[in-house]
Amino acid sequence: MESEKAMFVIVTYDVASKRVTKVMKTCRKYLKHVQKSVFEGMITEGKLNQLKNELISLIVCAEDKICIYKVDNLKYTSKEQIGIIEKDNNIL
C-alpha cells in the first residue's frame, strides 16, 4: 500500500465568537497555529478531509467562513514574515 502524499495547506477562518474556540481546537489537532485565525502545515488528503468534515460540523455556513489554500508543490513558494518570528515557523 502506497502512503498518501502530504501537501501544504493554509486554513483561515472568520466564525462567530461562540464557535471560535471549537474551530481553533479542531484546526490545532491537524495544523500549526500561526496567527489568531490562521493555521498552516503539511497534511495528507485523508487527514484534510477529516479536518474539513469536523469543521463543517462546527460552523453555520450562513454565518461563518473557512478558507483552505492547498499547495501541492512548495518549489515556487516563499514566506516572508514581519514582526514576531517563532523559532519553529519555517515551513515555507
Q: Where in this protein do the model-derived segments appear?
A:
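Basic nucleic-acid-binding interfaces
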Residues: 1-10, 16-92
